[in-house]
């Protein structure tokens, strides 16, 4: 992997992400649209060791009969704080972890990262449409 010039800060590996912090609550409302937002997400760029800070938007329908417990979600996000993970990987990881927890195909995760080096990055995974007919897992 290429290395950044200058000072590089230490960071943790992906195994420090605490998926076990996530908790789901039983919920009977499959057609209710749920949107969760936080401006407090941060991880570490594995190239430079500098912080990547962003706004996370989670949208979903609780088709699996579950909703995410918000305090557990906050603790899960905090576990990313010292993890070296690329922006695109972080979005994919959050999407996959929540999709597995909530057992829904109608989920979308968007992360809008703070501008760094004059570049604004937005990453997104998922869809609120769910699976299309004939789609293979």
Curated annotation (Swiss-Prot):
Family annotation (InterPro entries): GTP-CH-I_C/QueF, NADPH_dep_7-cyano-7-deazaG_red, QueF, QueF_type1
Subcellular compartments: Cytoplasm
Main function: Catalyzes the NADPH-dependent reduction of 7-cyano-7-deazaguanine (preQ0) to 7-aminomethyl-7-deazaguanine (preQ1).
UniProt pathway: tRNA modification; tRNA-queuosine biosynthesis
Gene3D superfamilies, per the entry: 3.30.1130.10
Keyword tags: Cytoplasm, NADP, Oxidoreductase, Queuosine biosynthesis
UniProt keyword NADP, yes or no: yes
One of the GO BP terms on file: tRNA modification
Name of the gene this protein is made from: queF
GO CC field: cytosol
EC code(s) of this entry: 1.7.1.13
Family in the record: Belongs to the GTP cyclohydrolase I family. QueF type 1 subfamily.
Entry superkingdom: Bacteria
Any one GO molecular function term: preQ1 synthase activity
Pfam families for the chain: QueF
Chain residues that bind substrate: 68-70, 87-88
Name assigned to this protein: NADPH-dependent 7-cyano-7-deazaguanine reductase
Reactions catalysed, as given in the entry: 7-aminomethyl-7-carbaguanine + 2 NADP(+) = 7-cyano-7-deazaguanine + 2 NADPH + 3 H(+)
Enzyme active site: 45 (thioimide intermediate), 52 (proton donor)
